[in-house]
């Protein structure tokens, strides 16, 4: 490709409304342009990267035995009514009527459509197992789209759905998809971690997320220092204390704490050990009989709302109770709440159950109890794992301790079981002629999100540093004063021809532009390998080569450059 015949569209200035580096660089590198909130057009450079990501995803899915199909983005609402998600999904589901007043949705996901397709097309166990995938546009009407392609309303996704009669083949397909996703991200040259995950709104049993590691990642990953164990912070299991509860050494006493509205203020003002304090959080209960529930964690710990969401007593999704409701029921407000004398159900974290001589709110404004001990001052409450893990704690596999990393979720695989097939009556006849409900798996990759995540992991102050496999161009040719030197023109054109014939994606900057601008553009768009051609190089019989990632420069003799670049591009 010649720059003179290409829409390069680079920008010097960082757009003011772009918050994260991937959004900034995708705009500056001329990859995307905003059409409306959360909606973007791909320019040539961005589309080249997107198509390379898509190609790797497609190749690995095909290798894993999945079959490509394509389903409509527009879906009939009656399928969503059938599964109950018409009401459950919320405002992210964009609903509309056609000219005949029939309800439709713009698909944020395709479980309903694929299940409807399979129940009509598959009738016998002989047709199973089956794994179908598509690469299709999705639309989710996010309340606040942000971070460019990281959280846009319209995005490109690979979603696959598998169908089975038995758990064994479902497990085999799940493992195949796990391996395929690992291969996809490995081929793209990205540092990543597969992690145990919560099944979320889609539901099901087993679930793994695939995270590209990046400091800007929204998700916190807890992983073992001694094994492959890793989990999303929402899913990571807290260790059950092995040490017995300590004996009481303090008397219970009521203390005035007028200026201690938070744990931090309480600890500072009274010189307390934060591990000897607890936080009492009041959430909405699951029934009229238990309208409020108290969840108690240690002062230095954080409530894990995903874990709390699974408690029978707690309404789903977890909702913090309004202060007015708390005051009406307890007589005090947040900052002064605690377990003694509390007339609502209490659930405490495992770590709280072994505490002694601890401090908590007294359920009277501006007062706390110090020296609280279980059994002596109040009965032990229901115990559960309801907190986030912290670094240094032992991991559940016993092979190490927790460490933390930030990640960007780009893939998610689920075992759905019969969540959709049962509600949609997707059945087949087994070997005995008996009707059986299908088991399902679901496997998603955010194709457009991978592009943004790759940038978040690979950039410097000059621009993007693309991994080889997904770079828009592998080699950039920079001819100095090309329009004034026939020698430079001839050699640049010959190299351009040779690289094209070798099947290498190459960008020849044939503009009448200053060298500084040409260098800046090549570095901004992240081309891995750059070759500079000038009269001085020609006199010396060498090309000047620069590696974008390492910054290393080399002089390569004319007759060695093509082989050198072929090897460099292969990695």
From Swiss-Prot:
UniProt catalytic activity: tRNA(Pro) + L-proline + ATP = L-prolyl-tRNA(Pro) + AMP + diphosphate
One of the record's GO cellular component terms: cytosol
SUPFAM superfamilies, alphabetized: Class II aaRS ABD-related (SSF52954), Class II aaRS and biotin synthetases (SSF55681), YbaK/ProRS associated domain (SSF55826)
Signal peptide annotation: none
First-listed, main subcellular location of the protein, grouped into a coarse class: cytoplasm
EC number of the protein: 6.1.1.15
Classification via Gene3D superfamilies: Anticodon-binding domain, Bira Bifunctional Protein, Domain 2, YbaK/aminoacyl-tRNA synthetase-associated domain
CDD domains: ProRS-INS, ProRS_anticodon_short, ProRS_core_prok
MF (Gene Ontology): aminoacyl-tRNA deacylase activity; ATP binding; proline-tRNA ligase activity
Listed Pfam families: HGTP_anticodon (PF03129), tRNA-synt_2b (PF00587), tRNA_edit (PF04073)
Keywords recorded for this protein, A-Z: Aminoacyl-tRNA synthetase, ATP-binding, Cytoplasm, Ligase, Nucleotide-binding, Protein biosynthesis
This protein's record includes keyword Cell cycle: no
Entry annotated with the keyword Lipoprotein: no
Enzyme class: ligase
Annotated InterPro entries: aa-tRNA-synt_IIb, aa-tRNA-synth_II, aa-tRNA-synth_II/BPL/LPL, Anticodon-bd, Anticodon-bd_dom_sf, Pro-tRNA-ligase_IIa, Pro-tRNA-synth_IIa_bac-type, Pro-tRNA-Synthase_IIa_type1
Subunit structure: Homodimer.
Role noted for this protein: Catalyzes the attachment of proline to tRNA(Pro) in a two-step reaction: proline is first activated by ATP to form Pro-AMP and then transferred to the acceptor end of tRNA(Pro). As ProRS can inadvertently accommodate and process non-cognate amino acids such as alanine and cysteine, to avoid such errors it has two additional distinct editing activities against alanine. One activity is designated as 'pretransfer' editing and involves the tRNA(Pro)-independent hydrolysis of activated Ala-AMP.
Homology family: Belongs to the class-II aminoacyl-tRNA synthetase family. ProS type 1 subfamily.
HAMAP family: Pro_tRNA_synth_type1
Record's protein name: Proline--tRNA ligase
Organism: Shewanella baltica (strain OS223)
């Amino acid at each position: 490709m010649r720059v003179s015949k290409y829409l390069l569209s680079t920008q010097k200035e960082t757009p003011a409304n772009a918050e994260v580096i991937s959004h900034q660089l995708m705009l500056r590198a001329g990859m995307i342009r905003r059409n409306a909130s959360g909606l973007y057009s791909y320019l040539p450079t961005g589309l080249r990267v997107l198509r390379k990501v898509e190609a790797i995803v497609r190749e690995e899915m095909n290798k894993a035995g999945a079959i490509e199909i394509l389903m409509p983005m527009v879906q009939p609402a009656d399928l969503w009514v059938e599964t109950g998600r018409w009401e459950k999904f919320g405002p992210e589901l964009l609903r509309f009527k056609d000219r005949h007043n029939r309800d439709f949705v713009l698909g944020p996901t395709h479980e309903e459509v694929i299940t409807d397709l399979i129940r009509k097309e598959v009738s016998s166990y002989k047709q199973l197992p089956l794994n179908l995938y598509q690469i299709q546009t999705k639309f989710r009407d996010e309340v606040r789209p942000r971070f460019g392609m990281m959280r846009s309303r319209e995005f490109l996704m690979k979603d696959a759905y598998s169908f089975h009669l038995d758990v064994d083949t479902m497990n085999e397909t799940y493992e195949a998809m796990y391996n395929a996703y690992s291969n996809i991200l490995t081929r793209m040259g990205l540092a990543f971690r597969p992690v145990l995950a919560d099944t979320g709104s889609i539901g099901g049993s087993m679930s793994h997320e695939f995270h590209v590691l990046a400091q800007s990642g929204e998700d916190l990953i807890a992983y073992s220092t001694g094994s492959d164990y890793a989990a999303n912070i929402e899913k990571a299991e807290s260790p059950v204390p092995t040490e017995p509860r300590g004996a009481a050494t303090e008397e219970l006493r009521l203390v005035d704490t007028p200026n201690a509205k938070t744990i931090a203020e309480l600890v500072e003002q009274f010189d307390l050990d934060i591990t000897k304090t607890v936080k009492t959080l009041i959430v909405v209960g699951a029934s009229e009989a238990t309208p409020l529930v108290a969840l108690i964690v240690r002062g230095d710990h954080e409530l894990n709302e995903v874990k709390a969401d699974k408690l029978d007593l707690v309404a789903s999704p977890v909702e913090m109770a309004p202060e007015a409701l708390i005051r009406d029921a307890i007589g005090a407000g947040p900052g002064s709440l605690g377990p003694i004398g509390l007339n609502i159900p209490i659930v405490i974290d495992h770590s709280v159950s072994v505490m002694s001589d601890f401090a908590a709110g007294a359920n009277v404004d501006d007062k706390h109890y110090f020296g609280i001990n279980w059994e002596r001052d109040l009965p032990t409450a229901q115990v559960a794992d309801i907190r986030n893990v912290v670094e240094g704690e032992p991991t559940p596999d016993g092979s190490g301790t927790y460490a933390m990393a930030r990640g960007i979720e780009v893939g998610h695989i689920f075992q759905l079981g019969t969540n959709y097939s049962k509600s949609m009556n997707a059945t087949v006849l087994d070997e005995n002629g008996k009707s059986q409900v299908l088991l399902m798996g679901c496997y998603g990759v955010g194709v457009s999100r991978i592009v943004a995540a790759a940038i978040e992991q690979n950039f410097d102050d000059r621009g993007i540093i693309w991994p080889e496999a997904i770079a828009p161009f592998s080699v950039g040719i920079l001819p100095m004063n090309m329009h004034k030197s026939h020698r430079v023109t001839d050699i640049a054109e010959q190299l351009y021809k040779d690289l094209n014939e070798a099947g290498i994606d190459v960008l020849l900057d044939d503009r009448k532009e200053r060298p500084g601008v040409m260098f800046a553009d090549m570095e901004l768009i992240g081309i891995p390998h750059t070759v500079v051609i000038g009269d001085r190089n020609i006199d010396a019989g060498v090309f000047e080569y620069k590696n974008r990632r390492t910054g290393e420069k080399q002089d390569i003799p004319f007759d060695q450059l093509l082989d050198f670049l072929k090897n460099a591009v292969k990695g």
